[in-house]
Amino acid sequence: AASMAACGARANVAVVSGGSVPKLYMNARDHVKKDVKALENCIGSFALLITPDDGQTPVIRLDSLGKHTVGAGAAPQAITSALTFEPLQKAGLKMTDVDKYAPELHNAEITLPAGAGNVPEANYKMIAALSVMKGQIERADIPKFVAERGMPGFVPTQGHIPSGVPYIGHALEALKAGTIKRAMIIGKGSLFLGRLTNLADGASFIMEGPGAGTEPAQGVSQSDVTEMLLAALSDVAANLQKG
């Protein structure tokens, strides 16, 4: 969607997604066993409007998109590296240059009683551990990294709704207000794909404030071109005389 808007193929692109009815009360059996109320009683959905860069709205960087390729492997460390470290490295950024990471933002109140753990916290710890491996933070700074660059999970467990996408609205407000400079939105994992192929899918992108990471174009005047041509011709003439 962002690529179509950026290249001018489409002026406005709407990205709309809804939850899955069959996944209502998906973990209810475990909740009931533990005498916990079945909380999965809502369907999550979201919609985004992608437009060309107007210089005033936060942007999606298209030069550093993350993707989980088949060759990356299915190990959690490999997936995390493909979706965070590699695209940041491509953009010349460090893991600490991202103010907020938004991975799978499952609501822990639902997943903990179901035995799935605190999914967002596990993701943040993995990202922090990868930062330690790359020498970008110290091991003792892992809790601080998680606290400052993470967030509690708040999203219904509805298919791919609990990715990082629901944070986009909050990120837009924070980027406009200047409270953060950069956020990374991460989506990964597919239960059905994983069951069928033992592989996972994933993608990520970086959001930045208006004008961030861009430099004004340097205009070249006619006189500049003339001077460069004259200098080049002088060099050619000098070489011919030497010959």
What do these predicted ranges mean?
Residues 1-15, 19, 50, 158-179:
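Active-site-proximal alpha-helical scaffold in enzymes
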Residues 17-26, 187-192:
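Acidic, glycine-rich active-site loops and adjacent beta-strand->loop/helix elements
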Residues 21-31, 165-168:
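Active-site-adjacent elements of ketosynthase-type condensing enzymes
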Residues 29-103, 109, 126-138, 147-150, ...:
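Condensing-enzyme catalytic core mediating Claisen C-C bond formation in acyl metabolism
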Residues 108-114, 194:
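Short acidic/glycine-rich loop or secondary-structure boundary segments that cap or lie
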Residues 118-125, 145:
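Transmembrane beta-barrel domains of bacterial outer-membrane proteins
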Residues 146-155, 159-163:
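Active-site-adjacent helical/loop segments in soluble small-molecule enzymes
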Residues 169, 173-203, 212:
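Long, low-complexity C-terminal extensions of enzymes
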